[in-house]
């Protein structure tokens, strides 16, 4: 895993943390959120590298 991807993931995760309160009824919600944000971080990194 590359450091820029993790930095992007961390930034996105911190931006999304307030959403956790609205998703507490779903035990899997934090994992699904983290998985989505990590995927977006990878995608963003590859888009930046490709341009």
Curated annotation (Swiss-Prot):
It comes from the Bacteria. Keywords: Nitrogen fixation. One of its GO terms (biological process) is nitrogen fixation. May protect the nitrogenase Fe-Mo protein from oxidative damage. Belongs to the NifW family. Homotrimer; associates with NifD. This is Nitrogenase-stabilizing/protective protein NifW. It comes from Klebsiella oxytoca.
């Amino acid at each position: 895993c590359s450091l820029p991807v993790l930095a992007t993931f961390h930034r996105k995760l911190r931006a999304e943390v307030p959403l956790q309160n609205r998703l507490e009824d779903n035990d899997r919600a934090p994992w699904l959120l983290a998985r989505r944000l990590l995927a977006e971080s990878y995608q963003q990194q590859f888009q930046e590298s490709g341009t």
